[in-house]
Amino acid sequence: MNPILSSSSSATNDSVLSPTPIDLINPTIKTMKRFYSKHSTRTYKWRVQQVKAMLTMLTSNMSLFQAALLTDLGKCSVEAQLTEITTMVLECKEVLQKLASWMRSEDVGSPLLLAPAFLEIRFEPRGVCLVIGPFNYPVTLTLGPVISALAAGNPVVIKPSDLCPAVANLLTKLIPTYFDPEVVNVVNGAIPETTELMRNEWGLVFFTGSERVGKIIAGQAAATMSPVVLELGGKSPLIICEDIPEMKAMCNRIIWGKSINAGQTCVAPDYVLCHEKNAEEVLREMKNSLEVMFR
């Protein structure tokens, strides 16, 4: 039995998150690295099995994911399905459809001096990966990178957001049902647990969150020479040109993009720049859109 998972699933209340004991983190990572060193994750068959397991986990537990998202974020079932669950189901299906072609080596031209040798680009797994998920899309932005890592032949440690305990507890309960402990593990907690995770060398660290924390993660990853991907926040301005024939439709789309997921989307419209002659109309149409959507 995976010691991390068994210790993390002790919470009886979905709104309470039990941190993973610090002393269990490193032994589990070492076990996963030993498994990876056997090279069994490189095959097409293994990768497909893992993605299919993720797909089954999602489709068989949709109501549980919806309930967890409602508990953590107050997200209704329709929005949960649209922005979190269905997107991951579709991602799994796309990976299964295209994985064989993604795994093919690419032939490249070789200089005459190297003949009869030939050159090719091979796409290799990176090793055991760490995915640190955010609070705003705790399913999509956590499991999305996990799906990619598994498809690329990498075991994964998942660190869900401690701000979404219901989703974290659900993942802790479901993951060992669908994945071997050497393949996917869940580590729960906050700063101490994340700090302990970052003391290890990783094949890749994928972090989604704020710029402030991203700088910390990047610094910790540099200490072990672990490659890191940072998906951070930013600015998403909108520019409204002087002559817009469909002002009402445009404002509806702006308000929808700003209000979906309570505005907690990294590419949500941030601010609007418009010609002064359109300012009053833009404000009026946006107010109307808000009233229609939320009355």
Each model region followed by its residue ranges:
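Aldehyde/semialdehyde dehydrogenase
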Residues: 2, 37-56, 192-217, 267-295
